[in-house]
Regions:
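N-terminal leader/linker segments that initiate helical-solenoid repeat arrays
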Residues: 19-42, 47-51
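Amphipathic alpha-helical scaffolding segments comprising HEAT/armadillo-like alpha-solenoid repeats
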Residues: 28-41, 62-74, 94-106, 128-138
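Bacterial N-terminal signal peptides
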Residues: 5-16
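Eukaryotic acidic, Ser/Thr-rich intrinsically disordered low-complexity regions
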Residues: 117-144
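Short inter-helical turns and helix N-cap capping residues of alpha-solenoid HEAT/ARM repeat scaffolds
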Residues: 45-46, 77-78, 109-110
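Conserved hydrophobic register position within alpha-solenoid helical repeats
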Residues: 53, 85, 116-117, 121
Length: 144
């Protein structure tokens, strides 16, 4: 009996999460209060909070966070936090953000951080090339 109840609960949970992820209007508006809270979190002394804020700023592609994230990438002593900042900069994707990631490949003292930055920059360039190839294909097909 316990086995059947467990299977039922797991199936219900699976169905709920499947339908919950299909909501296209999950995040439609990002309030200024949210952005300022995340940017303030970058100045916290709590390492976990800083990492989480950097991650969310990247996920939300908040371009006003580029300068504080660049500062973390250049100056912070913690490798994990610098990697989180580099990932956020990669996700934001502005030319200034991508350039900061590119420069960290050459100038960061940590080989681990440099390798992660190289991976992020490689993905950026690969996606850029794919987009250019798609555009070229569309132009060529439209001219036929």
């Amino acid at each position: 009996m316990k086995f059947l109840v467990t299977i039922f609960l797991l199936t219900s949970l699976l169905i709920e999460t499947s339908y919950a992820s299909g909501n296209p209007k999950a995040i439609t508006e990002i309030r200024q209060n949210t952005i300022s809270s995340l940017e303030n979190g970058l100045n916290s002394k709590n390492l976990g909070l800083k990492s989480s804020c950097a991650y969310m700023l990247g996920e939300l592609r908040i371009s006003t966070a580029v300068i504080p994230l660049m500062k973390i990438l250049r100056e912070n002593e913690n490798e994990d936090l610098r990697i989180a900042a580099a990932l956020a900069l990669y996700k934001i994707g502005t030319p200034m953000a991508i350039n900061a990631v590119k420069q960290s490949i050459r100038f960061d003292n940590s080989e681990r951080v440099s390798k992660h930055c190289a991976s992020f920059y490689y993905e950026h360039m690969k996606n850029k090339l794919i987009d250019e190839e798609k555009n070229d294909y569309v132009v060529k097909t439209a001219r036929k």
